[in-house]
Regions:
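Short alpha-helix in the alpha/beta-hydrolase fold that links the catalytic acid
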Residues: 225-232
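Conserved alpha/beta-hydrolase catalytic His-Asp/Glu region
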Residues: 129-131, 148-206
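Catalytic histidine-centered segment of alpha/beta-hydrolase-like enzymes
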Residues: 244-260
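Short beta-strand/loop motif that positions the catalytic acidic residue
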Residues: 209, 214-217
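Flexible "cap/lid" loop of the alpha/beta hydrolase fold
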Residues: 96, 100, 112-145
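Acidic catalytic loop of the alpha/beta-hydrolase fold
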Residues: 219-224
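Conserved HGGG/HGGXW glycine-rich cap/lid loop of the alpha/beta-hydrolase fold
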Residues: 2-60
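Active-site loop/oxyanion-hole signature of alpha/beta-hydrolase fold enzymes
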Residues: 44-88, 97, 101, 261
């Protein structure tokens, strides 16, 4: 599992921030955020297990607990004790499970890791029927028509129509690169199933009770209805919510400046940055 650390450009004593992407699983999903966040934080991004063409087949017990443990191990290895976390879609689920691991460590170890904040972008508390239908369509495409049909269709779930029209050449180039490194189909299906099955529960709520929570949702998200952002906030019991009118599911790409400003305002309002 590859991970990358981009150190803060202004403060060697800055806190760390961990970035977890969604279903695609790659660190480069965050390239438009990393340079911005580097002004204030040391930035840790990583490629999730099972997302490369050369990766082994995922175990049937693959879970977000497992994915969170991998991040926990990286934090151990790098001796990171305080950190912020940003997760896009299922990346936010990794963050919630990581909060549980930190809570367990707090109860058993004299030295422990502290999650300072968790930002969830276009995530959910439990799967919405609309999102379930989207996943069903993608699964059927992958099984019946193969990887190319799956990859060529994904822009429809991620980006606004006008953005696709404007950036079709860049989208096509990115799709071509993705096809060259497409992971085993078994792994894609396993990751989708894991996303479908995940639900927020009272243990997540308790572990995040004293963590600063931030929820970002997009009204024009075709994959995850905006109501799920509100439901997630309600399930976890507190936090700041920002609803954006445009940008769709992958607003970190299509509205990167707005996302970056929204993140900045959240961290500044909690005195995490000056």
């Amino acid at each position: 599992m590859n991970y990358f650390i981009d150190h803060c450009t202004n403060d060697s004593a800055a806190d760390f921030i961990v970035l977890a992407s969604g279903l695609g699983g790659h660190a480069n999903f965050w390239k438009l955020q990393i340079k911005f966040l580097q002004q204030y934080f040391h930035v840790l991004s990583y490629d999730q297990e099972g997302c490369h063409a050369s990766d082994s087949l995922l175990d049937e017990q693959y879970s977000f607990q497992h994915l969170a443990q991998q991040v926990f191990n990286i934090l151990d290895q790098e001796q990171i004790t305080k950190f912020h976390f940003i997760g896009h879609a299922i990346g936010a689920f990794i963050g919630t499970e990581l909060a549980l691991l930190c809570e367990q460590e707090l109860q058993s170890q004299p030295q422990f890791k502290q999650m300072l904040s968790l930002t969830s972008i276009n995530a959910w508390d439990e799967l919405d029927p609309h999102t379930a239908k989207c996943f069903e369509a993608r699964i059927h495409l992958l099984k019946s028509a193969g990887a190319e049909a799956y990859v060529r269709a994904q822009a429809l779930f991620l980006y606004p129509p006008a953005w696709i029209s404007q950036f079709i050449n860049e989208i096509t180039q990115a799709e071509n690169q993705q096809l060259l490194a497409f992971p085993p189909i078994h792994n894609v299906l396993t990751r989708i199933k894991t996303a479908v099955d995940f639900e927020i529960n009272h243990l997540h709520r308790e572990a995040l009770e004293y963590v600063a929570l931030h929820f970002i949702g997009n009204e024009d998200d075709f994959l995850v209805p905006i109501q799920k952002t509100r439901d997630l906030q309600q399930s976890l019991g507190h936090g700041t919510m920002n609803i954006l009118s445009h940008g769709a599911h992958a607003s970190t790409v299509t509205q990167s400046d707005l996302i970056n400003r929204t993140l900045f305002e959240f961290y500044k309002s909690h005195n995490f940055i000056e």
